[in-house]
Amino acid sequence: MANSLYQKHIISIPELSREELELIVETAGNIKKEPQPDLLKNKVIASCFFEASTRTRLSFETAIQRLGGSVIGFDSAGNTSLAQKGETLADSVQIIASYANAYVMRHPREGAARLASEFSNGTPVINAGDGANQHPTQTLLDLYTIYETQGRLDNLNIAFVGDLKYGRTVHSLTQALAKFNGVKFFFIAPEVLAMPDYICEELDELGIEYQLLNSMEEAIPELDILYMTRVQKERFDESEYAHIKSAYILSAADLKPARENLKVLHPLPRIDEINIDVDKTPHAYYFQQAENGVYARQALLALVLNESL
């Protein structure tokens, strides 16, 4: 298969084909089995995080260094010319991208990554999260983790639990899995945090089955993947938050009727939505999922910056 990802901007999941997603997943698995320390030799990657990040930033920078590349950039916009001197984002991108072979960016503004791609003068832009919009590289590591644990991306039953309204990770992953066959979704959330209508409408147009549920209990026996998310406290008053939060806490006891192959995933950080007793069950896979971020991002960088591997 030709590498259609070479020199491509990675802005959103809908712009990636099933074949491209499969190529990234396959490459991540190959790199995990057999490290490739020279794929980014003599390459410079700009890592520009305009808002706080721990896992994504460190995962990207680890991926770059393990492939033999060099990193330039910053982890806070506070000390940049944008903040100190009023430079526009477009000007900043144009200058920094000229120093690098690829430009990795996280920004609080929706659409910032798309804007960056228009001013990077051909340097590939990789979206590391733009507001509540898209987080494509989280989706890539999620897909790789699902494939690693289930051996397939077709014919899966997957539930998303918690904040499905604002959680960009669940939007992107739903759109990605919708490219595969026989996937059934369970969306488990309070009405105020339900999956956005546009996602459900996309699934309706594709004829993909999904259910809207209020509790995990009835779905767990059917699932291959249980994807937990954090309910964000700042969006509720204290009493409402306490009520909603308590309805979506997963314990080891809840997993007793689960299939043997069920894996529990979470984009992290978790707060109270997964009890620590789940950590010791064979279903817990969220820490391995976070580790897989390095391999998925290595695969993406390698494919974007090498015409062939």
UniProtKB/Swiss-Prot annotation:
GO terms for biological process: 'de novo' pyrimidine nucleobase biosynthetic process; 'de novo' UMP biosynthetic process; amino acid metabolic process. Pathway: Pyrimidine metabolism; UMP biosynthesis via de novo pathway; (S)-dihydroorotate from bicarbonate: step 2/3. The keyword Transferase applies. L-aspartate binds at residues 85, 168, 230. It catalyses: carbamoyl phosphate + L-aspartate = N-carbamoyl-L-aspartate + phosphate + H(+). Keywords: Pyrimidine biosynthesis, Transferase. Carbamoyl phosphate binds at residues 55-56, 106, 135, 138, 268-269. Belongs to the aspartate/ornithine carbamoyltransferase superfamily. ATCase family. This is Aspartate carbamoyltransferase catalytic subunit.
